[in-house]
Curated annotation (Swiss-Prot):
Protein name, as recorded: Protein BOBBER 2
Function summary: Small heat shock protein required for the establishment of auxin gradients and for patterning of the apical domain of the embryo. Involved in the specification of the cotyledon primordia. Also required for normal inflorescence and floral meristem function, normal developmental patterning and thermotolerance. Acts as a molecular chaperone.
Chain residue ranges for the region called Disordered: 67-125
Biased composition (Basic and acidic residues): 67-102, 110-120
SUPFAM superfamilies in the record: HSP20-like chaperones
Domain CS: 131-220
CDD domains per record: p23_NUDC_like
Location of N-acetylalanine modifications: A2
Alphabetical list of InterPro entries matching this protein: CS_dom (IPR007052), HSP20-like_chaperone (IPR008978), NudC_fam (IPR037898)
Keywords: Acetylation, Chaperone, Coiled coil, Cytoplasm, Developmental protein
Cited PROSITE patterns: CS
Subcellular location: Cytoplasm; Cytoplasmic granule
Length: 293
């Protein structure tokens, strides 16, 4: 487990850096940044350098997803505010005046009963394919799980206690009750898990799944379960996979949905199709007494 924030607290003297950024070729800019880091520090010589860079990239992606989520929420609020004046503009008589046709109707009017409380069962996941709670939120893709925990502004890494084991996570501030403390839905790879403090006000924990072909129904034991049928894998993630791996992932997702709906999975469908072809090719054979599993 690596702690990224520790390298941020002891900062050496500042080194000037200038470079032009071409949006069509961001990798070139990153290469220049890494060249400067390699020349001006020993960071790239560390054994954990690659892992820490990957964790920083994942943290940046998480911030981008959260920004997009907030943007969508603002747009939905604006659309609701636009609709409200339209309703308010209706005159009282227009709202209260019953239609003559309804008074002449002979059939009894069907009144929709008020909806009862939400049925217990899986919950629709958030935009990150996880859930939002009062003290933290989590999201996932097939390979990783990300947990974000808001902290008081100015929080330092030395004030945080974070213990990541194969099947359990403990996170909180030293001297206080743990914020997250429980067993994972499934095991993780501790050596490929990281935590970091973003802007001194957010603990971000990155977990690498042991089984990277399964969606987690919850992050920590005791949480409500999400409906894994409603998860939305990132298109870019699937596009980055090689054809064989992508086909396996899509097959797994299809089988998972079929299983939850009580429908046949892909291998069962394939067997039935093969049997139909065989029967069609051998019309003279009698299959009436045959038993099929």
């Amino acid at each position: 487990m690596a702690i990224i924030s520790e390298m941020e607290e002891a900062r050496p003297s500042m080194v000037p850096f200038t470079a032009s950024f071409d949006p069509s070729n961001p990798i070139a800019f990153l290469e220049k940044v890494l060249d400067v880091i390699g020349k001006e520090s020993n960071f790239l010589k560390k054994d954990t350098a690659e892992k820490e860079i990957v964790a920083a990239v994942m943290a940046a992606k998480q911030r981008l997803r959260e920004a997009e989520k907030k943007k969508l929420e603002k747009e939905s609020v604006k659309s609701m505010e636009v609709e409200k004046p339209k309703k308010d503009s209706l005159k009282p008589t227009e709202l209260e005046k019953p239609k003559e046709e309804s008074l002449m109707a002979t059939d009894p009017m069907e009144i929709e009963k008020p909806k009862e409380e939400k049925e217990s069962g899986p919950i629709v996941p958030n935009k990150g394919n996880g859930l939002d709670f009062e003290k933290y939120s989590w999201g996932q893709n097939l390979q990783e799980v990300t947990i974000n925990i808001p902290m008081p502004e100015g929080t330092k890494s030395r004030s945080v206690t974070c213990e990541i084991k194969k099947n359990r996570l403990k996170v909180g501030l030293k001297g206080q009750d743990l914020i997250v403390d429980g067993e994972f839905f499934n095991s993780v790879k501790p050596d490929d898990c990281f935590w970091n403090i973003e802007d001194q006000k957010m603990i971000s924990v990155l977990l690498t799944k042991q089984d990277q072909m399964e969606w987690w129904k919850y992050c920590v034991k005791g949480e409500p379960e999400i409906d894994t049928q409603k998860v939305e894998p990132e298109t870019s993630k699937l596009g980055d996979l090689d054809p064989e791996t992508r086909a396996s992932v899509e097959k797994m997702m299809f089988d998972q949905r079929q299983k939850q709906m009580g429908l046949p999975r892909s291998d069962e469908i394939e067997k039935k199709d093969m049997l139909k072809k065989f029967m069609a090719q051998n019309p003279g054979m009698d299959f009436s007494n045959a038993k099929f599993n």
